[in-house]
Amino acid sequence: MDRKENITPNTLEIQKNDEIEGTFCHELFENSFFNEKLCQELLVELPNINKTASSTRIIKWIISNVDTCFTSHHDDNDLYQIKNYSKKIEDKWKEYRQILEKYT
């Protein structure tokens, strides 16, 4: 009897594919909307994800790209704008970033 391995992508792998609708990364990278609820859902899942070289790379990728979104938003020469930007959201991201960094 063949044993099928569970090949369902974990939360981080799904985030890495920013074309998947309904993810934090898709909302921010493709729709220019910082969805705080989706970010919080991602953070809640982190303790359930095995720490591997791959998960570390993906977390670093998420941090880097979200940081780039904020940098681009503040760059007058860049057309990218976070539609729901506020100082409060940026401050929240700084808190969330620290949580993510603990898993790298």
Task: Name what the model sees in each region.
Residues 25-32, 52, 79-82, 86:
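Alpha-helical rod/repeat scaffolding segments in eukaryotic adaptors/tethers
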Residues 63-104:
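Amphipathic alpha-helical binding modules
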